[in-house]
A protein has these predicted regions:
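Noncatalytic regulatory segments and standalone regulatory/sensor domains
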Residues: 42-47, 166-254
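Cysteine-nucleophile protease catalytic domains, especially the papain-like/related folds used
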Residues: 42-126, 131, 204-207, 223, ...
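Active-site-adjacent substructure of cysteine-protease-like catalytic cores
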Residues: 122, 126-174
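Helix-start (N-cap) detector for alpha-helical repeat units in TPR-like alpha-solenoids
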Residues: 214, 248-249, 282-283, 316-317
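TPR/Sel1-like alpha-solenoid repeat signature
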Residues: 224, 251-258, 270, 284-292, ...
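Structural marker of alpha-solenoid helical repeat scaffolds
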Residues: 243, 277, 311-312
């Protein structure tokens, strides 16, 4: 039996991320009524942006299309903007059924993440102004969740951050009906903080975030496997290996993705590389054995399968089943 993604903790991490972001929602078009008030806030009340060093003093992502949101539809609008930027040609109306929940009158964060994955994009969450400015300066727009109301009367809203200017202490966003809206950093800090400084990157799988961490990137790419976006997940794992060439999880994920793309030669090589990285782990030997058997390399498959059984571990029963299946093939 082929052990699909026998990688400890990755599936758990995906579920945890979705649980964490699944409990909030936005509440529609109040942003339009508040926009005049927001842009009028004092620029001198914060050094929010200037506190971040080692970044350009100003940056702007110029190629993000703008879609004016319809009532209660800021989730589909924001997601459509960044998906189009990433190369996926969709309108907000194409996404509404995927991300908008009528009963909640808004879009959950987990729905945006799931939709991005279904369209072959890596959904990578960030938090904090340092990460936000790093991504903008790298040319990556960021969806942000802000609360335009109060803690006791929240008015959730999604916008897309496009730029910043440290000297002027300003943040530039596509929001509501306003393209390139300018907010003071003090205003942005307060409304974003109420949304727990949550940001979302929607990236092509060959493009790492500026602030990419290995575990977080691999968890995000595993989300593509979860929705069977095999070409995208294969690219995402290969991209990880360009930076973290000794990542066991990336080699295993690459092997799984390539196997599902019916590229047995490349899948076998990926699992072989994983065996070199963790020679005392039965999982890569089990998967390698399965692919070798499909390639008709039965003796090599038996050797690899037996090695997995000998190593044992929590998937020992699966390893035994793989070995028995290969033995039956060799006697047919």
């Amino acid at each position: 039996m082929f052990s699909r993604l026998l990688i400890p903790n990755v599936k758990h991490k995906i579920d945890t991320v979705l649980d964490q972001v699944g409990s909030r929602m936005i509440a529609g078009l109040l942003c339009l009524a508040l926009s005049v008030m927001l842009t009028g806030c004092s620029l001198s009340r914060s050094g929010y942006l200037s506190q971040v060093a080692e970044r350009p003093s100003k940056a702007m992502v110029v190629d993000v299309p703008f879609f004016a949101q319809k009532e209660l539809q800021c989730g589909p609008a924001a997601l459509a903007m960044v998906l189009n930027w990433s190369g996926v040609d969709l309108q907000p109306s194409d996404l509404s059924a995927e991300v908008y929940t009528p009963g909640l009158k808004g879009s959950l964060q987990s729905s945006l993440i799931g939709s991005a994955r279904r369209h072959g994009r890596v959904a990578y969450t960030i938090t904090g102004i340092e990460s936000l400015m790093a991504e903008i300066s790298a040319g990556h727009p960021v969806i942000v969740l802000v609360n335009l109301g109060f803690s006791w009367f929240p008015q959730w809203h999604y916008a897309v951050v496009l730029g910043y200017d440290q000297g002027k202490e300003e943040v530039i966003l596509h929001s509501g009906l306003i393209a390139n809206q300018i907010l003071s950093s003090w205003t942005f800090k307060n409304i974003w903080r109420r949304g727990e400084d949550w940001g979302l990157l929607v990236l092509p799988p060959d493009r790492l975030p500026e602030v990419a961490e290995e575990d977080e990137w691999l968890t995000a790419v595993a989300g593509l496997e979860h929705v069977e976006q095999w070409p995208a997940s294969a690219i995402g794992y290969a991209t990880a290996l360009e930076r973290w060439e000794e990542s066991f999880v990336a080699w295993m994920g690459l092997g799984n993705s390539l196997y599902n793309l019916h590229d047995l030669d490349s899948a076998a090589e990926a699992f072989y590389q994983a065996t070199l990285l963790q020679p005392e782990n039965g999982m890569p030997f089990n998967n390698w054995a399965h692919v070798l058997a499909e390639q008709g390399k039965r003796q090599e498959a038996l050797t690899a399968a037996q090695r997995a059984v000998d190593l044992g571990g929590p998937f020992h029963d699966t390893f035994v089943q793989t070995l028995e299946e290969i033995k039956r093939i060799t006697t047919d």
